[in-house]
């Protein structure tokens, strides 16, 4: 690190950290290029520290290599903020790369080892435990961390996301994270076993929660909020709330993608109380949840509302997993989708998606007016939103934690009067 001549600002001039390092809150740190923490080093970041990605250096980002750790343990009043180095008001999606953690847990690719897409194949970009994965691998702590204006596209379908988790193990702590204005996904898991809680995805481009390559962690308490004008290019990709694949070809590779999500609220682009678009909607929006390519994802106790389409179980392999009970969608609410388009199956499919939906205690309503209090904020401008259920909401009575897969989850009774709001004040422009 060297002083760049601005009081309180330091830049990461060297691309590699191989010894334990601490970044302090009295400095602002500038990431110029791809910064790697490797050789077992630990990067500690104090609460309240600001780290900026340099827009002028392509794909600037922070990479925590296998065997190394990040300890970014912020607080609700002193979050750690990763953001663009552009002036407030001039920041944009994709100004810099993002935060990437690479672990040694499960990965269902050949040999059990992969590399971060878009980058040169090397030990620095490698993740996965190979033939002997460590499901309890520890890549450190991310707690009360904001990641703003990330998401670098190297080429179509080869991007780094706001937070990329490659085969990250269950010994890692991921809690109270917000990704905003990413130029790709907010969160993407490539394999791994890490459990995550309190994840916010705010006005990102592509998918909010993307799971691939055998991810099997438990994820609870999530919020996704979409901007009607921010969606992917539909000739390249479509924007989903959930997108889940076993792998890119839908193979039977093991371990299978079987992550469990509970208590997720996803608010789509329609911004309305009934299933009709409120103004122009970007062409790339598609579904609240697209479960495809042999995934066995499980979604419980969640709300999908105000989108173009609701749940799509895409392809015969995913349909078979739904029939067998490996793929689950239980005790959820789908509300306010365009033209009441709550459920989708592929052309020619004989899968009875309606029966699957109703027998698993899910509800579908055409209007979302009586679900949440003020999901789009005052006047629909995202200021001071209130995501609590309204009195009489289906969300107050539709949850259940009786399924065996939810045994380790926190049982949280829905409330109209809860006072804890970990999102408050957590968005910067």
Segment roles from a protein language model:
Residues 78-79:
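Glycine-rich loop(s) and the adjacent beta-strand/alpha-helix scaffold that form part
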